[in-house]
């Protein structure tokens, strides 16, 4: 068996997909490495071990061998009834079918045991630090040189970035899932642009009059007094590519996948803290400024 491995300071990674096939069914989950089973990773063709293995074994199930029929005690051996019939089953077409009742089925049982597997290990990479394998749903991009020089399993340790479209989608979905409608709302929500406005409570309600019959020319005006208690201010807008005056999203990036995920989390946390910040107009300056809502 030919294997490839990656040695790190905290583990040893092993795979039997030596040709890097896209669709591949690994057999390593059925084997024992120095007496232990390998731990699965989120990549189905790679497994994690504590160290580079010295012995690989396959568990062989218990099996029954040497099936035969032996003549029961008390019955005489003859040409028609031999002492042993070497067969695992006597069917209707057998010459011994009529005397089958004179025999007991016998066999030997071999217990479960481990069979050593000959293997050849090719350590394709050695890493001084720890390798942290993390699952993700990103479509990662790398520079050409890293793609040429680095094994696919180790690409996640290299600098990476997301496309503008994917970065925009992450931001858009996160805002929609976490916005507090009491303090902000989305006014434009499209694949090509997103706008969020801040909802500010007025320091003093603004009185205004509306004509309920304004749309009916022949009716007398019916006036109603109303009060405006809130106003809206644009706080965030973004687009995946050039569109009108919208700022183009800056793609997420990181020195590796772990750093990328950390950068995405920090950006989204900071953004939502800004969007959901509870602000109201300041009474002291009569709405020229805003302050935190203490309620």
Curated annotation (Swiss-Prot):
Keyword vocabulary terms for this entry: Host-virus interaction, Inhibition of host innate immune response by virus, Viral immunoevasion
Domain of life: Viruses
Gene name, Swiss-Prot/TrEMBL: gad1
GO biological-process terms attached to the record: symbiont-mediated suppression of host innate immune response
Family of this protein: Belongs to the Caudoviricetes Gad1 anti-defense protein family.
Function (record text): Counteracts the host Gabija antiviral defense system by suppressing the ability of Gabija to cleave DNA.
Protein name: Gabija anti-defense 1
Disulfide feature: none
Changes seen on gene knockout: Knockout of this gene prevents the phage to overcome the host Gabija defense.
Quaternary structure note: Binds the Gabija complex as an octamer and inhibits its ability to bind and cleave DNA.
Organism of provenance: Bacillus phage phi3T
């Amino acid at each position: 068996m030919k294997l490839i491995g990656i040695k790190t300071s905290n583990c040893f990674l092993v795979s039997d997909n030596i040709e890097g096939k896209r669709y591949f069914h690994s057999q390593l989950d059925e084997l024992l490495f120095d007496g232990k089973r390998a731990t699965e990773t989120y990549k189905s063709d790679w497994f994690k071990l504590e160290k580079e293995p010295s012995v690989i074994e396959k568990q062989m199930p218990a099996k029954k061998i040497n099936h035969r029929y032996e003549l029961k005690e008390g019955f005489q051996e003859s040409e028609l009834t031999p002492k042993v019939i070497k067969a695992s089953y006597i069917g209707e077409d057998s010459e011994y079918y009529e005397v089958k009742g004179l025999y007991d089925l016998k066999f030997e049982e071999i217990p479960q045991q481990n069979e050593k597997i000959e293997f050849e290990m090719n350590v394709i990479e050695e890493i001084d630090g720890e390798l942290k394998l993390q699952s993700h749903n990103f479509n990662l991009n790398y520079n050409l040189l890293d793609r040429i020089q680095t094994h696919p399993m180790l690409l996640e340790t290299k600098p990476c970035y997301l496309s503008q479209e994917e970065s925009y989608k992450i931001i858009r979905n996160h805002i929609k899932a976490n916005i507090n409608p009491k303090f902000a709302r989305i006014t434009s929500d499209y694949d090509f642009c997103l706008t969020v406005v801040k909802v500010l409570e007025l320091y003093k309600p603004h009185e205004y009059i509306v004509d309920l019959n304004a749309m009916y020319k022949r009716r007398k005006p019916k006036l109603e007094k109303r009060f405006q208690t809130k106003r809206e201010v644009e706080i965030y807008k973004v687009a995946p590519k050039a569109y009108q005056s919208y700022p183009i999203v800056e793609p997420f990036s990181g020195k590796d996948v772990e750093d990328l995920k950390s950068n995405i989390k920090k950006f989204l946390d900071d953004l939502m803290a800004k969007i959901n910040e509870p602000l109201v107009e300041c009474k002291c300056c009569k709405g020229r400024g805003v302050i935190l809502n203490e309620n």
